[in-house]
Amino acid sequence: MFVKVCGVKSLEELEIVEKYADATGVVVNSKSKRNVPLDAAREIISSAKIPVFLVSTMKNREDWEVAIERTEARYIQIHSDVEPSLLPYLKDEYGVEIMKAFRVPQESENPERDAQMLLKKIRKYEADLILLDTGAGSGKMHDLRVTRIVAEEIPVVVAGGLKPENVEMVIKLVKPFGVDVSSGVERNGKKDEELVREFVRRAKNVVR
């Protein structure tokens, strides 16, 4: 089980996360409360012992180019409706691995229909990893019935409302490739070592 703990804002948080998680993420050029300047992101990326995804809602190719060049990121996570052609371009130009995020509704009236629509959209993008999220770092869970159907077709990373108390249930239900957490392992707005450790332990120990 691939476990990513996203939204580190400092070297102190990175030190906690990289003890336990397979990957982390640093948010730039976004309205997120976890947003950090590009120079800070570069320092986190260069100091890390695990992969650090450069996470952003940027839409323009030029903005992604500047961010990748300034931070020397090798992994990026796109949370916007960019043109599908951007992904192969960034891969060819910078050699980055790309996680593309897609939003899943919190409640679906027709999970099968919504899953098929989502799969059609996902297949337009040449991403290395697919993230299914509730969107905008909401800390809320989406309709897992949709995610489960998508996960039967392609490997997905699940995010949105995850925490130590529910990660086992989500993994057993959805059977994803991985899970991604941010606010669910924070206390007072900072990554908490006890919560990070417990989240990773529970995620890794699930028998599917």
UniProtKB/Swiss-Prot annotation:
The keyword ATP-binding does not apply. It catalyses: N-(5-phospho-beta-D-ribosyl)anthranilate = 1-(2-carboxyphenylamino)-1-deoxy-D-ribulose 5-phosphate. The keyword Cell wall biogenesis/degradation does not apply. GO terms for biological process: L-tryptophan biosynthetic process. InterPro entries: Aldolase_TIM (IPR013785), PRAI_dom (IPR001240), RibuloseP-bd_barrel (IPR011060), TrpF_fam (IPR044643). Signal peptide: none annotated. Its EC number is 5.3.1.24. It comes from the Archaea. One of its GO terms (molecular function) is phosphoribosylanthranilate isomerase activity. Gene3D superfamilies: Aldolase class I (3.20.20.70). Keywords: Amino-acid biosynthesis, Aromatic amino acid biosynthesis, Isomerase, Tryptophan biosynthesis. Pathway: Amino-acid biosynthesis; L-tryptophan biosynthesis; L-tryptophan from chorismate: step 3/5. CDD domains: PRAI (cd00405). Belongs to the TrpF family. HAMAP family: PRAI (MF_00135). This is N-(5'-phosphoribosyl)anthranilate isomerase. The gene is trpF.
